UniProtKB/Swiss-Prot annotation:
Subunit structure comment from the entry: Component of the CTF18-RFC complex which consists of CTF8, CTF18, DSCC1 and the RFC complex. Interacts with CTF8 and CTF18. Interacts with DDX11.
GO molecular function, one term: DNA binding
Family classification: Belongs to the DCC1 family.
Function: Loads PCNA onto primed templates regulating velocity, spacing and restart activity of replication forks. May couple DNA replication to sister chromatid cohesion through regulation of the acetylation of the cohesin subunit SMC3.
Taxonomic source organism: Homo sapiens (Human)
Species lineage: Eukaryota, Metazoa, Chordata, Craniata, Vertebrata
Name of the protein described by the UniProt record: Sister chromatid cohesion protein DCC1
Gene Ontology CC terms, in alphabetical order: chromatin; chromosome, centromeric region; Ctf18 RFC-like complex; nucleoplasm
Subcellular location field: Nucleus
């Protein structure tokens, strides 16, 4: 039954509201035939920040990603968000075409009664919270079948695991841009339309070909010509693999129309250290540093600073030792990461632990804030150290 203006005025009097202080237009709400279905969960409300609204209005998509055993996340083209249900104390009404007070002010309305049909209602909505992308699974998938070279028997096995970009977008809880960035970090490349990580021994084989050629030709590490590399090394390995190796360990540039690569000494020294450390549980630090320096190309200088997030030095053992500890092998969850680190070593200096928690920092979070939340600090021999806030089993 539709209300008349007299009934509306009578209601205002009962509520002791002054009509002069209100907009003249009146919404009279009534439930439509579809309201019960909408309230039963056929629809849900999603609160979006202005930039995401603009992306939708521009024709872009937002994607919800996650397997059945994972907490769903929402992804834009370049960001990842947690989805959280927020309950409300007031009923939220779905009213198609409902005009806001600002819209009504712009209209020439004289005591209009607007009969509005409620399409549905809800006591909660989904809200988004920016989060780090869940990228650990990406390396796990690609390491199921690392690329060992064109002559590997595994390449002839049609049942081996391989993933296209679409496969990764379907399985990784991260935005497309974040996935593509991480593929670069992992030094992944496309082979036959599938993303692959090079098996480390094969990667080092390629790198040795390049550094030996640089040495034999007496080139500067800052100016390695691409075309000559491909011509000389092409008979040994596929040209696309040689170029990929140069991209992984150097920076591409053009000089007088020719393509060159400036090799990164830190990356090459780091790779050589990993090669030495991966076959030893622990390595005498002094002996390691001597062998390491001998294993890198002449002219490059090794430094322990090159090994942050790759290896850890134990200064308290006698003799001092070094061992492999890769940050990408540690848990992705904050608390699990700290538990893992504190089970390995009871007390850490900030200098030692920083490379292993840097990737946990959010947009506005610092290493100091993470340490305050997950550890206690104390002084030991004049040096600030950090230990776990909770017992480690």
């Amino acid at each position: 039954m539709k209300r008349t203006r007299d009934e509306v005025d009578a209601t205002l009097q009962i509520a002791k509201l002054n009509a002069a202080e209100l907009l003249p237009a009146v919404h009279c709400l009534g439930f439509g035939p579809g309201a019960s279905g909408a309230a039963a969960g056929d629809f849900c409300l999603l609160e979006l920040e202005p930039t995401l609204c603009q992306q939708l209005e521009d024709g872009h998509s937002l994607v919800i990603r996650g397997d059945k055993d994972e907490q769903a996340v929402l992804c834009s083209k370049d960001k990842t968000y947690d989805l959280k249900i927020a309950d409300t104390s007031n009923m939220l009404l779905f009213i198609p075409g409902c005009k806001t007070p600002d819209q009504l002010k712009k209209e020439d309305s004289h005591c209009n009664i607007i009969h509005t049909e409620i399409f549905g209602f809800s006591n909660n909505y989904w809200e988004l919270r920016r989060r780090r992308p869940k990228l650990k699974k990406l390396k796990k998938l690609l390491m199921e079948n690392p690329y060992e070279g064109p002559d590997s028997q595994k390449e002839k096995d049609s049942n081996s695991s391989k993933y296209t970009t679409e496969d990764l977008l379907d399985q990784i809880q991260a935005s497309e841009e974040e996935i593509m960035t991480q593929l670069q970090v992992l030094n992944a490349c496309k082979i036959g339309g599938y993303w692959r990580i090079l098996e480390f021994d094969y990667e080092m084989k390629l790198l040795n070909h390049v550094t030996q050629l640089v040495d034999s030709e007496s080139w500067s590490f800052g100016k390695v010509p691409l075309n000559t590399c491909l011509q000389e090394l092409g008979p040994l390995e596929p040209e696309e693999m040689i170029e990929h190796c140069l991209k992984c360990y150097g920076k591409k540039y053009v000089d007088e129309g020719e393509v060159y690569f400036e090799l990164d000494a830190d990356k090459i020294c780091r790779a050589a250290a990993r090669m030495l450390l991966q076959n030893a549980v622990k390595f005498n630090l002094a002996e390691f540093q001597e062998v390491w320096q001998q294993s890198v190309p002449e002219g490059m200088v090794t430094s322990l600073d090159q090994l942050k997030g790759l290896a850890l030095v134990d200064r308290h053992s006698r003799p001092e030792i070094i061992f492999l500890l890769k940050v990408d092998d540690l848990p992705e969850d904050n608390q699990e990461r700290f538990n893992s680190l504190f089970s390995l070593r009871e007390k850490w200096t900030e200098e030692d632990i920083a490379p292993y928690i840097q990737d946990l920092c959010g947009e506005k979070q610092t290493i100091g804030a993470l340490l305050t939340k997950y550890s206690h600090s104390s002084m030991q021999n004049g040096v600030k150290v950090y230990n776990s806030r909770r017992p480690i089993s």
